[in-house]
Amino acid sequence: MQESQETHMSSHLDEVIAAVSVTSKNRLSNKLLQTALFQPPREKLHLCEERAKSYSSIREYKQAIQELVRCVALTKICYGDSHWKLAEAYVNLAQGYLQLKGLSLQAKQHAEKAKEILANSMESPYYNKTDIFKCSLELFYTLGKALVSLQKFKEAWENLIKAERLSKEMLQCGNIIKEEWIEIQSRIKLSFAQLYQGQKRSKEAFPYYQKALEYTETTKDEKSFECAQVLREMAGVEQALALHDASIGHFSQAHLIILSKEPSPEDAADSALSIARAAVASGMHDHHDVAEKYFQESMTYLKDSEGTEKAKFLSIQDEFCSFLQTIGQKERAAMILRESLEAKIGVFGDFSPEVAETYRILGRADLAQGNNNGAHMKLKKCVQIETFLYGSQDKKTMATQQTIDTLSKISETPVKSKQSLKAKTAFCTSVPQYVTPGKARHSAAE
């Protein structure tokens, strides 16, 4: 009986282990997890910290956040509510949230909680001041970065300035080594660049991006994701400053890095699309081939996809057709759009903005070619969809209806002319034909 209970317990434990296992590239073995269940809190804390770093390194940020939440709970158990290490755990959690889009407010809240804890920790004579300074530095940087994302630029600037000054003082006092300072500077400079660019101050942002790239290349591999991020953002600023060749070059450099990391089809498509857009933005004839090449490459990554990726493919295809129209290849653009119509109806539905816009463009293309009947039919379908989506009084709907009305008037004019001509002909044939005396009427055969 005892043996049966032990077997049951062992089986149950195996089920628990399987349930808490996290599938990932670096997943831990069941044996290690089983050991972890019976570890003391401090050992568990260390394990969670290592797992959080591991997940972050492979960009699995949701799993990293789960581990960072556990770190906060375990740090409270190990050190209490007023220890600087708890502030550090909250800072790390805030940084985790910053990795995910749309969670900057949560990051700010956790950073402010860390600030509150750290203020109490400062009063204790037992803690190592260097540790507290390092934690303060990360706190100011993290809070500044979160505030940039929330577009609270004045508060963000104040926190980033504090981080920069503290890092310089710590370097001078020997609290950190030069390599640590460069790594911190790479992040601070990038946040300053984002702060200025967020305010559309591209000229001021640009030198910060240059410094951020220089420091990032020093501390990371030149082919790292971090470098690719800085290159892409800097290329966007160069585009705003009309430095088009440099912009295309840096987008291309980032694209090569991204492709070397085995990206998802969507990430690869986005990267190629950024080069195409930069080439289009230049407005230069010399860049037309570059734009077409990367539009085609971007679509190739998503060509056989389904669902949201299929929708993205069709969106990129529309953008490519718009580019073709601007460079005078209107017939080619119309042909691609005609072929895409069935797929758009399948993905977006019959009554969707995407389908309406396609009918509008095709209608205008027919109009330009003198095919008034085809134009009228397509624009009629367009206005039906727009009326359903936006109502008959919407500006877009009214503009399409006005085009249809104008087209109808043009179509009616030749009909009236033909009817008038027929009436005149009928009148002429009804007038009696008088024969000159002494002359016979000629037959039709003659």
UniProtKB/Swiss-Prot annotation:
GO BP term, example: positive regulation of smoothened signaling pathway
TPR repeats: 45-78, 137-170, 186-219, 356-389
Compartment(s) of residence: Cell projection, Cilium
Pfam family, one: TPR_8
Domain of life the protein comes from: Eukaryota
SUPFAM superfamilies attached to this UniProt entry: TPR-like
Signal peptide start-end: none
Alphabetic keyword roster: Cell projection, Repeat, TPR repeat
Main location: other
A cellular component term, taken from the record's GO annotations: cilium
InterPro entries in the cross-refs: TPR-like_helical_dom_sf, TPR_rpt, TTC23/TTC23L
Subunit structure as annotated in this protein's UniProt entry: Associated with the EvC complex composed of EFCAB7, IQCE, EVC2 and EVC.
Role noted for this protein: Participates positively in the ciliary Hedgehog (Hh) signaling.
Protein name: Tetratricopeptide repeat protein 23
Lineage, opening ranks: Eukaryota, Metazoa, Chordata, Craniata, Vertebrata
